[in-house]
């Protein structure tokens, strides 16, 4: 469900001073001010290890490695979140475009955007996510 306003209250309330201490400048700008890291520079763009991608702000599990695919766009791409409850979608009118912004549904951190040009044999969606908004927890591959 997309929200048009920025008035949603998230369960995890962030302390700005603590976030500035804990996050890198890029992580802070991406998650708190909807900045975008440069294409092909993110830590997880080409990661293929098995595991879970979590919100860098509140550690909510967001995406599984099994949903990750190489889109060629320069940012980590996933065809679905871990489940329908972990992300919040908001209409974004910035930069003269209309897009759907993706946020962590627990803390409201900006993650990236979702587009309808993902793998047609999956969901048809491409969650284009900034590496700076994520932490990766590796897990052994299932046999």
Curated annotation (Swiss-Prot):
Sequence ranges assigned to domain MsrB in this UniProt record: 16-139
What is the name listed in the Swiss-Prot or TrEMBL entry for this protein? Peptide methionine sulfoxide reductase MsrB
- Name the source's superkingdom: Bacteria
Q: Which UniProt keywords apply?
A: Metal-binding, Oxidoreductase, Zinc
Cofactor(s) essential for the protein: Zn(2+)
One annotated Gene Ontology cellular component of this protein: cytoplasm
Q: Which family does it belong to?
A: Belongs to the MsrB Met sulfoxide reductase family.
Q: Give this protein's Gene Ontology molecular function annotations.
A: peptide-methionine (R)-S-oxide reductase activity; zinc ion binding
Which source organism does the UniProt entry give?
Burkholderia ambifaria (strain MC40-6)
Cofactor annotation remark: Binds 1 zinc ion per subunit. The zinc ion is important for the structural integrity of the protein.
Mind listing the GO biological process terms from this record?
A: protein repair; response to oxidative stress
The answer to keyword DNA damage applying to this record is: no
The UniProt annotation places Zn(2+) binding at 55, 58, 104, 107
